Amino acid sequence: MTDHRARYGPHNPGETYVSHAIGEQLTDLGEVEMNYATTGDTGSPALLLIPGQTESWWGYQTAMPRLAKHFQVFAVDLRGQGRSTRTPGRYTLDNMGNDLVRFIDRVIDRPTIVSGLSSGGVLSAWLSAYAKTGQIVAACYEDPPLFASEVRPATGPGIRQCIGPVFELWNTYLGDQWSIGAWEAMRAAAPGRLPKWMQGFPIGDKPSQELKEYDPEWGRAFWTGSVAASCDHERMLRSVSVPHVLLTHHFRVVDDQTGNLLGAMTDGQGARVRELLVEAGVSVDYRSFPTVGHSMHGTEPDMFVDILLEWIAELGE
């Protein structure tokens, strides 16, 4: 037994959440109540920010004040993260993407620029392919694991050759909706359970704030491939209709012997993403940052804002 069992989530806000400088609110999208924060002038262009896996909306809070000088900014918690609804058995890219389509319709209510990190970057790609006509003006994919988050990708390593074993570890010992919560047992088991090349992955004495706000069933959905069972990445990229995409590609190292990837995409996968987007008629601005961590907006917020503003200004020209 452990005192972390079933302790975290919207059912127990006092144990799970902390306050933030920017106010939060919930909107009813049907299956889920989506939590979000917004700042900026209502007359400014709309910018939707989509966090990555284990990240709540407040991962963007350092970047939001500068962005709010130019946009009305909306940062969301995806289903299963932050204060948004947990949906057992329902964590798929299509469900998450359609949540965002409804959010744009009901809350933003006008054409939107979208930027997403990691799995949020994959959802940014999803929106640029499958959102309603006219909803998305332009899309930024911030270090997205396109192909690399699939179990059987069309090119390059898949989820089980990169971060996947960590997701599997979390879900095994923490359980769907934190139903097991065996944090100490997970820490003890990690050295023998994780692949040798991941032995140094940090696991603290207690859950981080990010993990408290995360449903570990997300990790299982990626490990098993159910998250993308109906959303093949190559097909999705061939379907992109948004005219402009900014693709940022951050730190990555590939083991030549095993093919294991430390990072979100290999160079080959990034090249294939660009190739498919260009074939679809998209104008792609690819920017490589091999020394920048996975979350540029988290670790280098000024760099993130500068790049985003520069790219958007170029679109206006």
Map each language-model feature to its residues.
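Conserved hydrolase catalytic core segment
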Residues: 110-153
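Conserved loop-alpha-helix segment in the C-terminal half of the alpha/beta-hydrolase fold
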Residues: 241-292
